[in-house]
């Protein structure tokens, strides 16, 4: 999988969006707490607002879809693990995006409180959830090759 930051002006089919969210919700989570909810943004004006949420989110402006994963702030058996759980769910979305012939880019929001609050306000989210990230996606308008990042020097065996 690679980060895709340029998208075709073509909508993503609802069936494909559902497959992405099914992949996310298939993720394991600490204590099986499944802390996630997902906001699927297709409104161009809202996407434009979200694209200004961070210094690195400008690429979202051209995406037909932005998925905003959020997690519950309270009532989780292992609250401290919620962001790790969200990372696993987010990666599942990314892998499924690639499998469906789509492209996407993960835009970090949490744990930076100012970014979390800004996205929360833009989408008028309920008070009981925290914003985890933005995931801009669509049909790729660019082609990028996966780089081989394998580095044996980073592997250490303890025998």
Predicted regions and their residues:
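Acidic, surface-exposed loops and disordered segments
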Residues: 1-159
């Amino acid at each position: 999988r690679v980060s895709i930051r340029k998208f075709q002006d073509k909508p993503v089919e609802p069936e494909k969006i559902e497959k992405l969210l099914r992949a996310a919700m298939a993720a394991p989570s600490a204590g099986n707490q499944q802390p996630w909810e997902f906001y699927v943004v297709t409104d161009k004006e809202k996407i434009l607002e979200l694209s200004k949420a961070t210094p690195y989110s400008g690429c979202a402006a051209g995406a037909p879809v932005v998925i905003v994963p959020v997690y519950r702030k309270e009532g989780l058996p292992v609250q401290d693990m919620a962001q790790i759980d969200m990372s696993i769910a987010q990666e599942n979305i990314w892998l499924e995006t690639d499998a469906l012939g789509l492209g996407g880019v993960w835009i970090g929001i949490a744990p930076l409180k100012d970014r979390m609050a800004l996205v929360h306000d833009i989408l008028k989210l309920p008070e009981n959830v925290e914003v985890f990230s933005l995931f801009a996606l669509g049909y790729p308008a660019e082609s990028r090759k996966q780089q081989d990042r394998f580095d044996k020097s980073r592997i250490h065996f303890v025998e």
